[in-house]
Amino acid sequence: MEGTRGHILQLMVMGVLLGMTFPGYGANQTPGYDDTTTPEILNPYWMATIPDIYSVSDVTMPGTHNTMALYGGSLAECNSWSLTSQLRAGIRFLDIRVRHAKGNLTIHHGISYQYAHFGDVLMDVVAFLREYPSETVLMRLKEELSDTRDIYGAVVRYINVYAHWDLLWHSREIPTMGEARGKLIVLQDFTGPDLGIRYNSLDIADDWKVSSLQPEEVAKKWRSVSTHLEAATVGNKNRMFLTYSSGASILAHPNALARLINPRLYEYLTGYDDQSKRFGIVAMDFPGAKLVQTIIGFNY
């Protein structure tokens, strides 16, 4: 979910001041949408059978938008599974937002603190890759409401303390699966020397501003998603494609929109005849385990 930090802040403050209520979590677990804490299906080592010679850009992979946004109410929350549960369910793209203050990197969604810091994220990823060395994890790393300090230096310090330098893929070039196994690929969305692949080098569709849950607004969002997915199937194979199915506004909270978009995405993908198509990364809010599994299935 992109946009100015000030706009996000205004939305969150407005939601509190207006006391607006939206459909709450009801422990919904469907093929496309899940706001429970436990995935229905696990796919912890699905990359193991992908040939080493395949480029990571050839892989169709499920991801989550604002991966760690588990707290803060319905306008801030984008997922209900823990990071470890997401990885075990098959999620391989993480969208991590860090706030840099006084040398610390805490996890935030806008003004909402997520009761975690970047070290927690790194430790979970390290533990997962040690248990499943056939896998790779892509991580968009973005500043959220930071001060003016050097975020690059703080990120490097956290990596050295909570992980290890060799965990990272150290190149702007997209690796093959053989090169990427057991690695964390940082998609760098902040200034400074290279830590990995620059986020803005990807072909990205992130039309996150959905003004309401009215049918025409939801349809507009879905057209953006489906159009970019189709573009990924015929696009440059040497470039990674990233499609966000997520969106939000004061009148369209992430969970409410995901309940409408995710079933469409699931129906669209399950109805696709050609399982060899490359869709790239599909980043979602509250994905259902069967939707995750369906995305994985396009690699076989």
For the regions a language model picked out, list residue spans one by one:
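Long, acidic (Asp/Glu-rich), low-complexity accessory segments flanking structured domains
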Residues: 3, 19-93, 102-131, 136, ...
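A motif-centric signal for short, conserved binding hotspots located
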Residues: 97
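A residue-level signal for conserved active-site and pocket-lining positions in enzyme catalytic cores
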Residues: 139, 186, 282
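Surface-exposed substrate-engagement region within the catalytic domains
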Residues: 162-274
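Aromatic-acidic/polar surface patches that form glycan- and anion
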Residues: 72-79, 87, 114, 118, ...
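Classical eukaryotic N-terminal signal peptides for Sec-dependent ER targeting/secretion
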Residues: 1-15
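Active-site groove signature of glycoside hydrolases
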Residues: 100, 133-147
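Distinct, well-ordered alpha-helical segments
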Residues: 151-156
